[in-house]
């Protein structure tokens, strides 16, 4: 068989493998997103205990959640991209999320006492808010950093560069759709009927299932690291500004609505759901738009 035919056949087989694993990977991202935002609601309730108010818990957890995700993506993303086993990275991240989140739920009383002692009985506002954000970030960092690495890991499993971005759009939309379901289920169903610990256990089971099932997905060869181009840097700046404005508006609306609503956590859950629905719809629309312009 001529070498050219071998290379073409290998490329076709690789494309078939990616296509065959795209939807199973999306289902894993739905479950992972459900667990992640379920944890966020659980952590918001926990943080409200040691910070003394639900609005403080919302702001601290939002900052710690997205800050940890950014740290994880920046710190682990390049290593995962160069790895020959991104599926194992993904499984390891899901396992770490499950273990750390269960530990936080089990040690809720101990963590609350430690944070209250750290803050003190009558803290100055600057001291109180500094410790609220810093302490919450450090407490949640292992889990949130692992969350930040899951999307790059699954993206590496599928090999985004070969399909014009359709895989990453599908994964992002699926992850966000799962997040919507996780917010609603945790805030309005699981926590009221099962409590914080059992809700965290439900989310942890999903993480463990994702960890095990992800090992069955195809693994692509490790990719060579590439330096970001000026165009890529400008896109990152745009995405940073978009995230800043999007979450900033969300927190602002939560702050305003606390003046007229009784329960900040439920208000936050509803607003977060609306934000995530729009984000998922945009990612799905982008994926369809790209698919009409890029050959499979």
PLM region spans:
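Alpha-helical transmembrane segments of multi-pass membrane proteins
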Residues: 1-296
């Amino acid at each position: 068989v001529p070498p050219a035919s071998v290379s073409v056949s290998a490329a076709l087989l690789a494309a078939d493998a990616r296509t065959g694993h795209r939807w199973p990977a999306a289902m894993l991202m739905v479950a992972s997103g459900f667990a992640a935002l379920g944890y966020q609601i659980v952590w918001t309730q926990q943080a409200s205990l040691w910070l003394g108010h639900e609005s403080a818990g919302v702001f601290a957890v939002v900052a710690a959640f997205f800050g940890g995700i950014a740290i994880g993506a920046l710190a682990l993303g390049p290593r995962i991209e160069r790895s020959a086993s991104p599926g194992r990275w993904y499984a390891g991240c899901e396992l770490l999320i499950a273990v750390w989140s269960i530990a936080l739920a089990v040690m809720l009383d101990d963590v609350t006492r430690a944070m209250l002692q750290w803050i003190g009985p009558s803290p100055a506002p600057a001291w109180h808010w500094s410790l609220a954000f810093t302490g919450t970030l450090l407490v949640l960092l292992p889990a949130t950093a692992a969350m930040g690495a899951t999307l790059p890991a699954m993206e590496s499993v599928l090999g985004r560069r070969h399909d014009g971005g359709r895989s990453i759009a599908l994964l992002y939309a699926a992850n966000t759709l799962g997040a919507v379901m996780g917010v609603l289920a945790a805030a309005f169903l699981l926590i009221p009927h099962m409590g914080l610990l059992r809700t965290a256990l439900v989310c942890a089971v999903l993480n463990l299932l994702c960890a095990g099932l992800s090992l069955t997905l195809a693994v692509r060869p490790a990719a060579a690291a590439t330096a970001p181009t000026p165009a890529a840097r400008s896109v990152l700046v745009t995405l940073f500004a978009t995230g800043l404005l999007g979450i900033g508006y969300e927190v602002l609306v939560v702050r305003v609505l606390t003046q007229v609503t009784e329960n900040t956590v439920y208000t936050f859950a509803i607003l977060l759901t609306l934000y995530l629905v729009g984000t998922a719809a945009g990612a799905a629309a982008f994926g369809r738009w790209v698919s009409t312009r890029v050959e499979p």
